[in-house]
Amino acid sequence: MNAHEADREFEGRSFRDEDLSRLRTERVVFTECDFTGADLSDSDHTGSAFRNCTFRRTSLWHSTFRHCSFLGSSFAECRLRPLTVIEVDFTLAVLANVDLRKADLSDCRLRETSLVGTDLREAVLARADLTGARVQGAKVEGADLRGARVDPTFWTTAAVRGAKVDIDQAIAFAAAHGLDIGG
């Protein structure tokens, strides 16, 4: 793969253990590709899509993803921090047990994403869409959730102590825990 790729498509390709550090992509579509063990550190991606891709033991630290999609992709044992994501779509992705402490996921779509056991302590999830996300055992303590869209089960299954929330979310939290807030 070239150091800079634009307007290309890769389907079912294996990038296992490849050095893709400093890779630049623009509007590139990866479908069902395998990035197991690949080094994508210091890479920069704009408008690219990673559909149903596998990231296992992949290094993504110091990488930037702008307006990208990881629809249905799975991440396991990856080095992600520090990572910059700007309006990224993680719909249906699997980020279970991933370390995203202090990550800025503002304005990202995490609809129906598996965040089971994910460490999101002190992460910024402002205005993120977490509708339908599975968050059993997720650590969200101290995170900024203001303006985030979540389901009632989010409030009962994720550890949210010390999280920053807005008034509507505080009411939703109380209702999810069966509190009578009507007076």
Which stretches of residues belong to each language-model region?
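Tandem repeat scaffolds
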Residues: 1-183
